[in-house]
Amino acid sequence: MGLDNYIQTAMRSILRNPILEVLTEIKITKILKQSNFVKREVGYPPFQIILHFVYMLVMNKRQSTFIKNSENAFGKDAYYRFIKESRYNWRKFLILSSAAILQRIKPLHKNGEHRLLIIDDTVEPKRGKFIEGSCKYVWSNKEHKSINALNIVSLNYADSHSTFQVDFSIKMNDSKRKEISEFTSKLHHRSNSYQRKSEIIKSKNTLAIEMLERALNNGVEADYLLVDSWYAKPNFIEKANELGMPVISRLPNNKLIWNFKGKHKTMNAIYESLKNSRHKSGGQHGKISYKYFDAIIEHAVLGKIKLVFLHTGKDLLVFISTDITIAGKEIIATYKKRWNIEQGYKDLRNLFGLGKEENRIYEALIAKITLSMFTYNIVSYINRIKHEPQTLGELFRDLECELETLAISMQLFIQILTKISEIQNVVKDNKDLLNIIAVLSAYTKKQLGFMCES
């Protein structure tokens, strides 16, 4: 074994980069090629630039700070060109990387645990007048008023332990701040960015079904699709069923949308006809006590479905499952997991830069949102496979400290060896020292992806 191999073998057991290990596991280089990320567009390897963006997010560094403090960073123009490149397929990159991660955690699932796909949307405030894709009068549940914002519809994966981001679309309403024809980039009609831009005026339900179909076609597996009452329309649920995905949802109490067969056609009428004859079970959610019962009902479009009527003493909530074999208690417990994604959005904003994109060009916004979600998935996966799972916030801070400490420590060590090598007598006595320094430096950069200035 040569000197190089001895050094690398010794360092491999000490100098471990969890992020780089995950990227290697999911074969990120292959995914980048499949997603049309090629070096010739920006002049640098796409893998290296992606890695730098991940480090910026995990280490909580602004791009300018990262460039200033890392001797291996590229010029700022390289990063800007990268996120504005119209030929890159960011959607495919996110879906394929998510599918690869989900395949890695598949053996960790226990019998009886449901794997869920969740469709939801979030609103990210954007005050700038010229931000492409942003709209006026977007309702924010957080602020309880209409604001200027991006409306992001997303497809997420969740189980009993983790959540992952699979796909997303930006939805633009009639109060858009800029027409699509006024967007900065003039795109070729066959480019990936043009295809992505064209979907912006589609309805939320259409975007959701398209995302679901793409995920299933790319190998994402799940037991149920969870949606809130906005998406719970018979035609939407029918299309999801046709894709082989049973739906669990809360229903809007709207007799125009939901009309059933038989004598009692509305949800209120069905509830009133059954409430005295059905056995009711009780439950507790926080401080709220409730009673519920379930019934199998015939619907003109969906056929036999199971409805769960949950009464808190004040409000009547109705849930639907197109899988009629599942118990009412399990339907309620499964639907509660839809709220996992709210914590996911919170982590994305607080830890991974979602909503803090300093770009107004549509292609750059798509790229930065994708990078935030991709980094979230990497950290979530690291948390999942650790023996002592933490909250993402705790793990995020650990990774931030670990990466920076490794980089600075190795840089200092190499500088010390370099100073030693400058002493003439030492170099004479140990001809391999310069070679050792070169190998240490090269291997450290390979393992970490960057080197900090000490």
Question: Where is each model-derived feature located?
Answer:
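A short, flexible helix-boundary coil/loop motif
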Residues: 1-44, 172-188, 194-204, 209-213, ...
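Short amphipathic alpha-helical "interface-anchor" segments enriched in bulky aromatics
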Residues: 20, 117-123, 271, 279, ...
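Short, positively charged, Gly/Tyr-enriched micro-motifs
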Residues: 33-103, 112, 154, 159-164, ...
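Short, conserved catalytic/metal-binding motifs centered on acidic residues
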Residues: 52, 66-69, 113-127, 155, ...
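Electropositive, glycine- and tryptophan-enriched low-complexity nucleic-acid-binding patches
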Residues: 59, 77-81, 142-220, 304-318
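Active-site-proximal, Lys/Arg-enriched surface segment
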Residues: 85-175, 289-293
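A short acidic (Asp/Glu
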Residues: 127-130, 233-240, 256-262
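Acidic, His- and aromatic-enriched active-site or binding-groove loops in soluble protein domains
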Residues: 245-256
